[in-house]
Amino acid sequence: MMILEGYGSVLAFFVIASLIPVIALSASKLLRPRGGGPERRTTYESGIEPMGEAWIQFNIRYYMFALVFVVFDVETLFLYPWAVTFQRLGLSAFFEVLIFIIVLLIGLVYAWRKGALEWS
């Protein structure tokens, strides 16, 4: 039990972070206007009449760009705490992060060579 002693604030954070979306969604469901006519079920397109079908198939290139973006966004998520504590971690942590960046760069070069980043 002594190991978990300092984690009360973390537990409180997770409970509050879980309750905020639940409360927001519940409040919006309780306070929303009821009813509505057939106009309410139509697609909203910037205040003008919808043109064409709402269901279209996106080009796969959008997904490839999104995937590459997410990979490098997660890289930033991992690199920021490392950069903040860089002086305390020492040389071994530097080489671990260097290997991490090299692996990501290999993935970027692979995606680039496969044409995943080309838009033509």
Curated annotation (Swiss-Prot):
Catalysed reaction equations from the record: a plastoquinone + NADH + (n+1) H(+)(in) = a plastoquinol + NAD(+) + n H(+)(out); a plastoquinone + NADPH + (n+1) H(+)(in) = a plastoquinol + NADP(+) + n H(+)(out)
Enzyme Commission numbers on file: 7.1.1.-
Keywords: Chloroplast, Membrane, NAD, NADP, Plastid, Plastoquinone, Quinone, Thylakoid, Translocase, Transmembrane, Transmembrane helix, Transport
Enzyme class: translocase
Chief location category: plastid
Membrane topology, record value: Multi-pass membrane protein
Membrane-spanning intervals of the chain: 3-23, 64-84, 89-109
Gene Ontology MF, one: NADH dehydrogenase (ubiquinone) activity
InterPro entries per record: NAD(P)H_OxRDtase_bac/plastid, NADH_UbQ/plastoQ_OxRdtase_su3, NDAH_ubi_oxred_su3_sf
One Pfam entry name: Oxidored_q4
GO BP, one annotated term: photosynthesis, light reaction
Intracellular or extracellular location(s): Plastid, Chloroplast thylakoid membrane
Domain of life of the organism encoding this protein: Eukaryota
GO CC entries: chloroplast thylakoid membrane; NADH dehydrogenase complex
Subunit text: NDH is composed of at least 16 different subunits, 5 of which are encoded in the nucleus.
Family listed: Belongs to the complex I subunit 3 family.
Function description: NDH shuttles electrons from NAD(P)H:plastoquinone, via FMN and iron-sulfur (Fe-S) centers, to quinones in the photosynthetic chain and possibly in a chloroplast respiratory chain. The immediate electron acceptor for the enzyme in this species is believed to be plastoquinone. Couples the redox reaction to proton translocation, and thus conserves the redox energy in a proton gradient.
Protein name listed in UniProt: NAD(P)H-quinone oxidoreductase subunit 3, chloroplastic
Organism from which the protein derives: Nephroselmis olivacea
Lineage: Eukaryota, Viridiplantae, Chlorophyta, Nephroselmidophyceae, Nephroselmidales
